[in-house]
């Protein structure tokens, strides 16, 4: 069969890789990579760039961090974080001050539905199991 292909004069098309192997040039679009234009903000003048770098070094120094922390501890707007309501609760648990529900009926039987031992407040009133705005059906 190989002889039949040679005798018919059929030639395989030459691809770029074959031309490389045979030492022949091939046409392939090449991109010129330059670093002349890089996207980004415009360059600062030399004096302003030096001042910016100096301020960056000062801002990242330990002295500046300590000064900021001292200023933040003296800030009176964070007093609400130290309120007894928030400090006595465990993280991730519901606080009893916020989760108190007002019962809609007295006793063990719901007069509207006849349910025995069910919730005292309808959990589906707002479309999900929520009590005082806290969702409990994850």
UniProtKB/Swiss-Prot annotation:
Its main location: mitochondrion. It holds the Pfam family DUF1674. Residues 71-98 have a biased composition (Polar residues). Residues 1-32 form a transit peptide. The keyword Mitochondrion applies. One of its GO terms (molecular function) is protein folding chaperone. GO terms for biological process: cellular respiration; cellular response to reactive oxygen species; mitochondrial respiratory chain complex II assembly; positive regulation of succinate dehydrogenase activity. One of its GO terms (cellular component) is mitochondrial matrix. InterPro entries: SDHF4. It is found in: Mitochondrion matrix. Residues 71-138 are annotated as: Disordered. Keywords: Chaperone, Mitochondrion, Transit peptide. Signal peptide: none annotated. Interacts with SDH1 in its FAD-bound form. PANTHER family: SUCCINATE DEHYDROGENASE ASSEMBLY FACTOR 4, MITOCHONDRIAL (PTHR28524:SF3). Belongs to the SDHAF4 family. Plays an essential role in the assembly of succinate dehydrogenase (SDH), an enzyme complex (also referred to as respiratory complex II) that is a component of both the tricarboxylic acid (TCA) cycle and the mitochondrial electron transport chain, and which couples the oxidation of succinate to fumarate with the reduction of ubiquinone (coenzyme Q) to ubiquinol. Binds to the flavoprotein subunit SDH1 in its FAD-bound form, blocking the generation of excess reactive oxygen species (ROS) and facilitating its assembly with the iron-sulfur protein subunit SDH2 into the SDH catalytic dimer. This is Succinate dehydrogenase assembly factor 4, mitochondrial. It comes from Saccharomyces cerevisiae (strain ATCC 204508 / S288c) (Baker's yeast). The lineage of its organism: Eukaryota, Fungi, Dikarya, Ascomycota, Saccharomycotina. The gene is SDH8.
